[in-house]
C-alpha cells in the first residue's frame, strides 16, 4: 500500500486564461497525516478543494487520490426537519442502501461518532435548532461514519467558539494519529496548522505557492509575506510539553492605523 494518499503533479487551474489560481503546483499528502492549506481570501484554497473532491477538473497537470473522500463544507443547511442523529446517519447511506433502514449497529456507530465530537446529548435535537457551531460538529460526525479514507475539511473551525475549536483540532489530530485517516483542511489560522498539520501548502496567489513540512514553511517570514501582517512564532513549555504557536502582533500604532482605515472606508461609503 502506498504511503501517499494524494499526489499533486504540475497542477494548474484558471478561471480565465490570463489569471491562474494554481500553476505548476507540486505537493504530496501522506497517508494518515494532516495536510493544511493556508492563504488569504481569493487565493484558490476552495478551488483546490473542489479539484480534490472532483467538483472541478484541472486545466493542466494531474491529481491522484488514493481512497474514498468525505467532504465537510464550511457551511451546511438542512432543507428538512431532521434530527442531529438523522443528519449524522446520512454518512452511512452508502453502507445502509437506498431503501433500507439503518441497523442497530449503524445507529450505535453514529452515536459514538457524535459523542467523539461532544454532540451525543443533542442526538434527538432538530438539526435546524442547533447553533452554527453545533451543526458543524454534527457534520464532522457524519463524515466520520462514512468510513472514508480521506477527510477534506473546508475551514473546520470557522463557525466554532474557542472551546469547540480546541475540541475539533484535538479530534482532527486523533483521527489521523489513532484512526489512520488522512485529513486535508483549509484554514486562516496559522497556529491551528502548526498545532496539527504534518505538511502544509501556502497559496500566495496567481499560481505562486510554497509546499513542505508545516514546521519548516510556517515561518515568521513566510507568513508575514503571505498575510502582510506582523506575526511571531513562539515556543514554550506547557504541562511538561514543548509547544510552538504563531501569534499576530497588534501594536498600538497598528491598531490606530486599522481604526483610521476603517473610519476612512465608512466615510467613503456614506
Give the location of each predicted region.
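The feature captures the beta-strand-to-loop junction immediately N-terminal to the Walker
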Residues: 38-40
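Conserved ABC ATPase signature
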Residues: 126-130, 134
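H-loop (His-switch) and adjacent beta-strand-loop-beta switch element
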Residues: 200-213
Amino acid at each position: 500500500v502506498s504511503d501517499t494518499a494524494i499526489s499533486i503533479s504540475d497542477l494548474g487551474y484558471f478561471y480565465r486564461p490570463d489569471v491562474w489560481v494554481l500553476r505548476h503546483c507540486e505537493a504530496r499528502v501522506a497517508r494518515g497525516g494532516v495536510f493544511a492549506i493556508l492563504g488569504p481570501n481569493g487565493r484558490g484554497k476552495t478551488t483546490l478543494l473542489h479539484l480534490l473532491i472532483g467538483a472541478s477538473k484541472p486545466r493542466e497537470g494531474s491529481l491522484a487520490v488514493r481512497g474514498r473522500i468525505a467532504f465537510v463544507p464550511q457551511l451546511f443547511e438542512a432543507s428538512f426537519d431532521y434530527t442531529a442523529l438523522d443528519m449524522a446517519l446520512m454518512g452511512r447511506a452508502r453502507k445502509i442502501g437506498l431503501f433500507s433502514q439503518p441497523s442497530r449497529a449503524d445507529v450505535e456507530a453514529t452515536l459514538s461518532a457524535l459523542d467523539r465530537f461532544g454532540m451525543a446529548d443533542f442526538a434527538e435535537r432538530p438539526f435546524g435548532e442547533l447553533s452554527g457551531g453545533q451543526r458543524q460538529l454534527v457534520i464532522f460526525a457524519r463524515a466520520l461514519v462514512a468510513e472514508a479514507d480521506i477527510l477534506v475539511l473546508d475551514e473546520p473551525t470557522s463557525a466554532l467558539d474557542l472551546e469547540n475549536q480546541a475540541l475539533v483540532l484535538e479530534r482532527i489530530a486523533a483521527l489521523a494519529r489513532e484512526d489512520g485517516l488522512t485529513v486535508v483542511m483549509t484554514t486562516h489560522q496559522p497556529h491551528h496548522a502548526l498545532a496539527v498539520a504534518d505538511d502544509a501548502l501556502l497559496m500566495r496567489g496567481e499560481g505562486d505557492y510554497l509546499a513542505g513540512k508545516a514546521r519548516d514553511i510556517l515561518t515568521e517570514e513566510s507568513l508575514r509575506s503571505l498575510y502582510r501582517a506582523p506575526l511571531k512564532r513562539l515556543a514554550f513549555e506547557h504541562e511538561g510539553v514543548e509547544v510552538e504557536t504563531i501569534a499576530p502582533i497588534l501594536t498600538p500604532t497598528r491598531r490606530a492605523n486599522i481604526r483610521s482605515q476603517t473610519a476612512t472606508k465608512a466615510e467613503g461609503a456614506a
